[in-house]
Curated annotation (Swiss-Prot):
<protein>
    <recommendedName>
        <fullName>UPF0294 protein YE0917</fullName>
    </recommendedName>
</protein>
<dbReference type="InterPro" id="IPR036691">
    <property type="entry name" value="Endo/exonu/phosph_ase_sf"/>
</dbReference>
<dbReference type="GO" id="GO:0005737">
    <property type="term" value="C:cytoplasm"/>
</dbReference>
<dbReference type="Pfam" id="PF03372">
    <property type="entry name" value="Exo_endo_phos"/>
</dbReference>
<comment type="similarity">
    <text>Belongs to the UPF0294 family.</text>
</comment>
<keyword id="KW-0963">Cytoplasm</keyword>
<dbReference type="GO" id="GO:0003824">
    <property type="term" value="F:catalytic activity"/>
</dbReference>
<dbReference type="InterPro" id="IPR022958">
    <property type="entry name" value="UPF0294"/>
</dbReference>
<dbReference type="InterPro" id="IPR005135">
    <property type="entry name" value="Endo/exonuclease/phosphatase"/>
</dbReference>
Amino acid sequence: MPKRTYAMRYVAGQPVEQIFPGSAKQLGQGLPPGAPLPTTEFLRVMVWNIFKQQRAQWLSVLKEFGRDAQLMLLQEAQTTPELVRFATSHYQAADQVPAFALPQHPSGVMTLAATHPVYCCPLREREPLLRLSKSALITVYPIHDGRLLMVVNIHAVNFSLGVDVYSKQLEPIGEQIAMHRGPVILAGDFNAWSRQRVNALQRFAQGLGLEEVEFSTDNRSRAFGKPLDFVFYRGLTLADASVLVTRASDHNPLLVEFQP
C-alpha cells in the first residue's frame, strides 16, 4: 500500500501538526476565511534550494537576503531544530512535505508564510531511477485586496529518461492552478537541465497563462548551461527580481517582489 502524502505544519508554541491534502473541489467552491498576508508596498518571495542546510551561512542568507519576505519557498529543507526555530520565530506557519526521511530529520519542500494558509495540498512524485521522492506543496493565502493567492512550491524530479515522469509531476499542479480563480505564484527547483524539460515546462506555464520572471543579472544556478530555478506568476505585477551569489548552498537564492 503506498504511503499517504502529508505535510507537517510548524507553528510557534503549538505541537507539530500533520496535514493531509485538501480537496481540490474547495478551490472552485470557496475556501474558509483567513487573515491576509501582511503587505506594505510589495509582496516579497524568496525561493531557494537550501541543500539540506549542509553548508555554513545558510541561516544568515535566510535572515539577510530573505529579510521582510512574506513568503519563503525552500526546497531540500531539512527540519533540523535550527531551521524549525527560524521558521517559527519569523513566520506564522511553516508547512513542509517530507519527500524522504533522512536518519534524523525529513527533507522536502517547505513554505514559510507570514499568515496561515486557508488551503494546503502536499504532493509527491517518485524518482524513477533513484526511487527517491520529490515533493511539491500547494497553499492558498488571502491577500489585502480580498483575492486569494495560490502558491506552488516545487522540487521537480531530477533523474528520469525523457520527460514523461517530469510532466506527470506537473499534471496535478496544473489541474489545481486551472481551478483557481485568483493570482498564482509557481516557483522552485524545476531541474530543467535539458531542452526537452525546458520545452515541457514552458508549454505547461503558457497553457495556464503564467508569465516567467526574468532576471536582468541572471546568476541562477545552472546545469548543462540551463537554469534550474524558476518563478512563474499570474494576476500580479512584477516589481523586481534578483539573485544572490552565495556558497551557502549549491543553488543561488532568488528574491522576487510583486505589487499585489
